[in-house]
Swiss-Prot record:
Similarity-based family: Belongs to the PAL/histidase family.
Annotated organism of origin: Deinococcus deserti (strain DSM 17065 / CIP 109153 / LMG 22923 / VCD115)
Name listed for the protein in its UniProt record: Histidine ammonia-lyase
UniProt subcellular location: Cytoplasm
Pfam families: Lyase_aromatic
Enzyme superclass (EC): lyase
Entry EC no(s): 4.3.1.3
Gene name of this polypeptide: hutH
Pathway of action: Amino-acid degradation; L-histidine degradation into L-glutamate; N-formimidoyl-L-glutamate from L-histidine: step 1/3
Catalyzed reaction equations: L-histidine = trans-urocanate + NH4(+)
GO cellular component, one term: cytoplasm
Length: 499
């Protein structure tokens, strides 16, 4: 991939997860050089410019002598690299490397091309700085995590390479690279940004789209297993309230359910209408769809943005302090997605109850053969309920909390990284809950006696290739984990969509 002015989520995923190599375009390199020239002019002159020849945060009014400008940037990195917690996953770090390079490549930060080259070299070599997960307050960007990233560039800290965590200087030497000696503005250019938030959010958004499709499939399978009505999913129904997500969800449900033999078999039954968790799937799942669409629009802007401060304008030679580093757009988006994904899990768990509670259907209690001797999927619903309840706490918006920092110079922060990390937890839980629903729905279909809709039937048969029918109680966790892998890999959804 050639890094220039734009970066899509699809390109991001190709680099971060599929390790597509990245190189800097010639035009991007030219932009970087032009911005650097402005910094060199400032260094040679008498003008006081924040972050170039002054201190940082509350120390912005302290002028730093020219002979100490390199030390200033070095001090910035080592002092700010004080995050804590478990190391971030490699894919999150890869996303940070890519997004930081992308932002610098837009040519308004003033770092030298060598800085971007080393970021991309680490990325392409799959040499990943070890970055603690906690420490960002989301303004000025993700300072502490990005300082740990920058630490590796100067030969300090640790790098995960070849499956081992080793001293950064040792890995750089093995790969034939010299540690950077940061020059004026470069330390600040590396750490002022929203790249942790952006990386977490992009990865979660990609996975949430896949989960949404799988949740639609799970809902369709449950509808079939419970002999539910297809009429609420008709185009004429959702067309009277045509939110885009609801329209799309109903279309997908109809595709999964087409040519069902189950629906005609109960056409004359006396049931008037189904529970909300079945009947209102287009409206509930559709609202999540629309939230994901909005998040995609936010990321499209963010991936083409400069989140540094101060900003360099090479055409005029101006250097302007602003607030592009503030994570609020991403923080609010992460919080919205937390709720949207949590609701997918919430309604999925309620469909599990519909499948397992004998008072709500004609199915055996907990889908257990010889109930009493066997407990069936009784505790599977407990697990789903536990995860849904945990999500309710995690879904509390992180962005409504702000703690002033830097002696009140930075008096409002976004907490966006906190929200984005919570989003990943919620998403992981939701993937498990939907997997539990699929496990229950597949077992319920064993009692159907008719073929389900084409998409549902294909998914059911694929599940049965990995998870056999429950004949008696057994150790169910391995079954759930195998099914969860079908969900998270996208394999199950692909089979249903291609049927």
């Amino acid at each position: 991939m050639i890094l220039d002015t734009t970066l899509s989520v699809e390109q991001f995923i190709a680099v971060v997860r599929r390790h597509e190599p990245v190189e800097l375009s010639d035009t991007a390199r030219s932009r970087i050089v032009r911005a650097r020239a402005v910094i060199e002019q400032i260094v040679d002159g008498d003008q006081a410019v924040y972050g170039v020849n002054t201190g940082f945060g509350k120390f912005a009014s302290v002028r730093v002598d020219r002979a100490q400008l390199a030390q200033l940037q070095h001090n910035l990195i080592v002092s700010h690299a004080i995050g804590v917690g478990e190391p971030l996953p490699a894919e999150v770090v890869r996303g940070m490397l890519l997004l930081r390079a992308q932002s610098l490549a837009l040519g308004h930060s003033g770092a030298r091309p060598e800085v971007v080259d080393l970021l991309l070299a680490l990325l392409n070599a799959q040499a990943h700085p070890v970055i603690p997960a906690q420490g960002s307050v989301g303004a000025s960007g993700d300072l502490a995590p990005l300082a740990h990233l920058a630490l590796s560039l100067i030969g300090l800290g640790q790098i995960e390479y070849g499956g081992q965590i080793r001293p950064a200087a040792e890995v750089l030497n093995e790969l034939g690279w010299k540690p950077l000696k940061l020059q004026a503005k470069e330390g600040l250019a590396l750490i002022n940004g929203t790249q942790l938030m952006g990386s977490l959010l992009a990865l979660a958004l990609h996975d949430a789209w896949a989960l949404l499709g799988t949740a639609n499939l799970a809902a369709a399978m449950t509808v079939e297993a419970l002999s539910g009505s297809h009429r609420p999913f008709g185009a004429e129904v959702v067309g009277l309230r045509p939110h885009p997500g609801a329209v799309h969800t109903a279309e997908e449900l109809r595709r999964f359910l087409r040519e069902s033999q189950i629906a005609p078999s109960h056409a004359s039954c006396g049931k008037v209408q189904d529970a909300y968790s079945l009947r209102a799937v287009p409206q509930v799942h559709g609202a999540t769809h629309d939230a994901l669409s909005q998040a995609a629009r936010v990321l499209a802007v963010e991936f083409a943005s400069v989140t540094d401060n101060p900003l360099i304008f090479p055409d005029t030679g101006e250097v302007v302090s602003g607030g592009n580093f503030h994570g609020q757009p991403l923080a609010l988006t992460a919080d919205a997605l937390k709720v949207a994904v949590a609701e997918l899990a919430s309604i999925s768990e309620r469909r599990c109850e519909q499948l397992l509670n004998p008072a709500l259907s004609s199915l055996p209690g907990f889908l257990a053969p010889e109930g009493g001797l066997n407990s069936g999927f009784m505790i599977a619903q407990y697990t789903a309920a536990a995860l849904v309840s945990e999500n309710k706490v995690l879904a509390h918006p992180a962005s409504v909390d702000s703690i002033p920092t830097s002696a009140n110079q930075e008096d409002h922060v976004s907490m966006g990284a906190h929200g984005a990390r919570q989003l990943r937890q919620i998403l992981d839980h939701a993937q498990t809950v939907v997997s539990i629903e699929l496990m229950c729905a597949a077992q319920a279909l064993d009692f159907a006696g008719f073929r389900a809709g084409i998409g549902v039937q294909a998914a059911y048969e694929h599940i049965r290739g990995a998870v056999p029918t429950m004949q008696v109680d057994r150790y169910f966790q391995p079954d759930l984990l195998r099914l969860r892998e079908l969900v998270t890999s996208g394999d199950l959804l692909r089979v249903a969509q291609e049927a």
